[in-house]
């Protein structure tokens, strides 16, 4: 099974988030699953890959050439796919992955999460969509989703397509659904 992880590449975040990513990577590797990321070597993105490799897991990165050019690529990946655009990156990650876990992150992470969630709702795929949030950073997002549903902006059942988890074990279990 291939698990895509969306997460921050910011070098200025609290180290607890980087540790979380590393531990998730270890969990994926220990399960003998493959990790798919955006192909970068910094911050949480790099940590999740290092964790997977430390547990003898296989890692796959998908990165646009522009990011390779500024030395963000993780060349230790077992596979590193270099594409031209961010759109191609997301499409390839979606195509080659069997489930998606979103960790804390910024605008890019949220954009990836929303595309996967909406894609599941529209039946472009039927793959698990998981949020791993042990620190409560996505609590306001969860509340917003509930509010949007109560105001009929989100159809009933759409929120149920997201598995909201707080432990690595629960996140990995949700991927196996």
What are the residue ranges of the model-derived segments?
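A cross-family phosphate/adenosyl-ligand binding-site feature
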Residues: 1-96, 134-176
């Amino acid at each position: 099974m291939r698990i895509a992880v969306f997460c921050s590449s910011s070098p200025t975040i609290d180290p607890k988030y980087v540790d979380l990513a590393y531990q998730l990577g270890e969990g994926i590797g220990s399960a003998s699953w493959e990790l798919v990321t955006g192909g970068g070597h910094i911050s949480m993105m790099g940590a999740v890959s290092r964790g997977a490799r430390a547990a003898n897991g296989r890692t796959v990165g998908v990165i646009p050439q522009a990011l390779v050019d500024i030395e963000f690529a993780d060349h230790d990946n077992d596979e590193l796919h270099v594409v031209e655009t961010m759109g191609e990156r997301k499409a390839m990650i979606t195509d080659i992955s069997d489930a998606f876990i979103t960790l804390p992150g910024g605008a890019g992470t949220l954009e990836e999460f929303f595309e996967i969630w909406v894609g599941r709702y529209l039946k472009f795929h039927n793959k698990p969509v998981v949020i791993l949030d042990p620190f409560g950073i996505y609590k306001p997002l969860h509340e917003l989703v509930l509010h949007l549903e109560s105001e009929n902006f989100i159809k009933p059942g759409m929120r149920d397509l997201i598995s909201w988890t707080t432990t690595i074990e629960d996140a990995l279990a949700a991927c196996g659904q």
